[in-house]
From Swiss-Prot:
One of its GO terms (molecular function) is structural constituent of ribosome. Pfam families: Ribosomal_L21p. It comes from Teredinibacter turnerae (strain ATCC 39867 / T7901). InterPro entries: bL21-like, bL21-like_sf, Ribosomal_bL21, Ribosomal_bL21_CS. Belongs to the bacterial ribosomal protein bL21 family. This is Large ribosomal subunit protein bL21. This protein binds to 23S rRNA in the presence of protein L20. Part of the 50S ribosomal subunit. Contacts protein L20. Disulfide bonds: none annotated. GO terms for biological process: translation. PANTHER family: 50S RIBOSOMAL PROTEIN L21 (PTHR21349), LARGE RIBOSOMAL SUBUNIT PROTEIN BL21M (PTHR21349:SF0).
Amino acid sequence: MYAVIAAGGKQHRVEEGEVLRLEKIEVATGETVDFDQVLLVGSGADVKIGTPVVEGAKVTAEVVSHGRADKVTIIKFKRRKHHMKRQGHRQWYTEVKITGIQG
């Protein structure tokens, strides 16, 4: 069984037992989180598509860890002007393990 959920402004295809990196969620490590915005639920040839969400469907997950992604370096450069600006960014993420799909 699989599902498509909306979390953190993105859509993710998930299956039970899968570990997934999402945008940061303010939930402590080890706690469970429920995703109610389930856009699609499928099991073999049986597929339920929501308009926009599937009624009564829910995906539960356990928070595994929080962290920061690899650094992305931004460089702004103006030619012939001796001007260069460097900046780095590391995005926070939450790693969750999908424990159940209902619907």
